[in-house]
Amino acid sequence: MSMGTPHAVMVMGLPASGKSTITKSFADRGYLVLNRDAAGGRVRDLVDPFKRRLLAGRDVVLDNTFVTLEHRAPFTEAARKLGVPLECHWMQTSFEDCSVNACGRMFERYRWVFMTASDIKDHPEASEDPNIFPIAVLFAMKKKLEGVKKKGVWEVPCGKPTMDEGFSRIVKFAEPA
């Protein structure tokens, strides 16, 4: 628990980029973890628990993809209104490494190297596992994070985090060498 002002961290990045590994290091230091995968529901459903924990003086770490400004905004706004600094820890693991990590996770848990959406749906355990997803999900998330420009116009706005959103700092985690 914090002495004085609580501290908040948002860990973001593509699926299978290592967010939960970084989040665990905060949990080990006493931060309360909020994660949509564990809580179920939608990202916006975490806003009220986030506020309550900060109001109680607790340090909080948010663990989710947060690849769009729209998903981050309710949390940056809540932290700003409560006067709590919110750091963004951005996992910049490459798309290729995230793909390898996701396939490795599928194999480790279910002995499948690659699962399609229908394979996952039909598998009794994988269908209930929020950390198992078709690779198409990675493509969609990458598109949201990087944005898509056609003829100089953003067709899909860039979702990369900026200091203008209200973060106290942005820490970029490069992929391992």
Residue ranges, per PLM feature:
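Conserved GTP-binding G-domain of TRAFAC-class P-loop NTPases and closely related GTPase folds
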Residues: 2-12, 17, 25, 29, ...
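Short amphipathic alpha-helical segments and helix-helix/interface helices
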Residues: 23, 50-51, 76, 142-146
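Residue-level detector of anion-binding/catalytic polar loops
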Residues: 32, 59, 85, 104, ...
